[in-house]
Curated annotation (Swiss-Prot):
Organism: Saccharomyces cerevisiae (strain ATCC 204508 / S288c) (Baker's yeast)
Entry keyword set: Exonuclease, Hydrolase, Mitochondrion, Nuclease, Transit peptide
Record InterPro entries: Exonuclease_RNaseT/DNA_pol3 (IPR013520), Oligoribonuclease (IPR022894), RNaseH-like_sf (IPR012337), RNaseH_sf (IPR036397)
Pfam families linked to this entry: RNase_T
Protein name as catalogued: Oligoribonuclease, mitochondrial
GO terms (BP aspect): exonucleolytic trimming to generate mature 3'-end of 5.8S rRNA from tricistronic rRNA transcript (SSU-rRNA, 5.8S rRNA, LSU-rRNA); mitochondrial genome maintenance; U4 snRNA 3'-end processing; U5 snRNA 3'-end processing
Catalytic site: 184
Exonuclease domain boundaries: 55-227
Cellular component terms per the entry's GO annotation: mitochondrion
Chain's gene name: REX2
Length: 269
């Protein structure tokens, strides 16, 4: 077999299919990277391992609670793993988060209810909204890019927060691309709080009170701390359940059978 040598390739005169296979196998390594791609790689933090069951904590400040007519004016996002550890900033200094204020004019802000006018005015949010230059579309794209930086795959990140079903209701209309990227389930810390109030009210009474600063960032930090408190003090850790073989082996009684049992007990007296 005779071979012809050329720079960067070897061609077989009688077996050209071998060269085709060789070219395909190495072409992925020989493609030049553009300067734009290199800059993008440098700006995006490299995750060597995927986040463990990531939670996408989001809190929105709105002009009211009418998801049809009111608007999201501030949004904040913190991403944690399933152990509630926040992702780190690109420079390694502190935790990473995304936060932005959307511009609306006086024609929108003056229509807020009294509660929003007072609290958003006192917190300085109203002034930030009027001064902001960012549109809703810009903020949606920025938030989606931020989430995809740490959670590139769709239907992986789970939306989390306090009464986060309300935030999601607004985001379905105003941040549809973000909602489409996230999993359909949510982790609503307020649901655990309502269960604790009924199941163990004495313990729930010792739950640290929220400061209610009503800024998106402070609300998320308090929500994460609140879920951590429940995990430390209310929910059973794995070491307390792994050794209990009977858990889940018995079928729970239906409400009707429980009621019948109580009636039988009462007739025995």
């Amino acid at each position: 077999m005779k071979w012809l040598l050329f720079p960067a390739r070897i061609v077989a005169r009688t077996r050209p299919n071998l060269f085709s296979l060789y070219r395909r196998s190495v072409s992925q390594y020989l493609r030049p990277r553009t300067i734009q791609n290199l800059q993008s790689m440098a700006q995006t933090p490299e995750l060597k391992t995927k986040l463990f069951k990531p939670l996408v904590w989001i809190d929105c400040e709105m002009t009211g609670l009418d998801h049809v007519n009111d608007r999201i004016i501030e949004i904040c996002c913190i991403i944690t793993d399933g152990h509630l550890a926040p992702v780190k900033a690109a420079d390694g200094q502190g935790d990473s988060h995304y936060e932005s204020v959307i511009h609306y004019g006086p024609e929108v802000m003056n229509k807020m209810n009294e509660w929003c006018i007072e609290h958003h005015g006192n917190s300085g949010l109203t002034a930030k909204v009027l001064a902001s230059e960012k549109t809703l579309a810009q903020v949606e794209d920025e938030l989606l890019e931020y989430i995809q930086r740490y959670i590139p795959d769709k239907n992986v990140g789970v939306l989390a927060g306090n009464s986060v079903h309300m935030d999601r209701l607004f985001m379905v209309r105003e941040f549809p691309k973000v909602i489409d990227h996230l999993f359909y389930r949510i982790v609503d810390v307020s649901s655990i709080m309502e269960v604790a109030r009924r199941h163990n009210p004495a313990l729930q009474a010792r739950n640290p009170k929220k400061e209610a600063a009503h800024t998106a960032y402070s609300d998320i930090k308090e929500s994460i701390a609140q879920l951590q408190w429940y995990m430390d003090n209310y929910l059973k850790p794995p070491q307390e359940t792994e050794s209990v073989e009977s858990i889940g082996s018995e079928q729970p009684e239906s409400p009707s059978s429980s009621t019948s049992s109580l009636k039988r007990q009462r007739t025995d007296f």
